[in-house]
Amino acid sequence: MKKKEMLILTGPTAVGKTKLSIELAKAVGGEIISADSVQVYQKMDIGSAKILPGEMDGVRHHLIDVLSPDEKFDVFRFSQMVKEAMQGIYERGHIPVLVGGTGFYIQAVLYDIAFSEEETDSALRRQLEEEAAQKGNAYMHEKLAAIDPEAAAAIHENNSKRVIRAIEYYMQTGEKISVHNAREHEKESPYAFCYFVLNDDRKKLYDRIDARVDQMVEEGLYEEVKGLLADGIPRSATSMQALGYKEMADHICGDCPLEEAIYLIKRDTRHFAKRQLTWFRRERDVTWVDRTAFAGQEDEMLAFMLGKVDEMRNLNT
């Protein structure tokens, strides 16, 4: 039976996915679904490097600017929203092109992993949240690393919700959440898909990250975060744990000087890019698109990707 088609374009932060994703979507008659856990929020434009309407070049985009910064956003809600978007895309006779660097979210959609909305009144959950409030994110991340090193390597310590969830899962079941996720990952995808991972020379990538952070600061990251705080968005909100926002909020609230905040954003973003690449290397059925192999020529990269799409379609009969 012929499967519905889906394309994925992902890769580490600042690798340059946006322009290529537009060209890919135009070439296949696609609509883009953002797999970015920050661009989904309104008023969080600079720190998320959000695509501007004028850059979309007529390609319809989904899951951008749809939530208030004080709203909860997790893989459960993401999966729901993506399924709704995909239904409309298929009805219009188009192909969904999932674009972004949140590998866990991509995996959930690609393999149709079932998530249920987690209970929020669990006594154990509250106990772990209180422990995190008292001892800090770094302590909880070390606690997870002692239980499940693989999960700790995949989850940033700032993502306290996922760290706590992983510890909670182990304490409730006796099983590492990384083992659970690996088992779920063995499922066959219900889609005919191409899963492209864009990469570049590490030094070039890190230099691009540093330059992007400098540009964000120049464009008004400080003012953007200050505005969010003035709007009453708590520093504990899911949105405010994002890279760039947490560090700048710490500075605004007097916890560190500006120079240190900028240094931490650059350092932690580089670490995040490294973890993203580690995640994608563990994924199966991916096609790596290395900028160095194409000397940075995006037309050649696009032609290579379209060739893979043709191969996928020939097999999907």
Predicted regions and their residues:
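Phosphate/pyrophosphate-binding catalytic cores of soluble transferases and nucleic-acid-acting enzymes
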Residues: 1-317
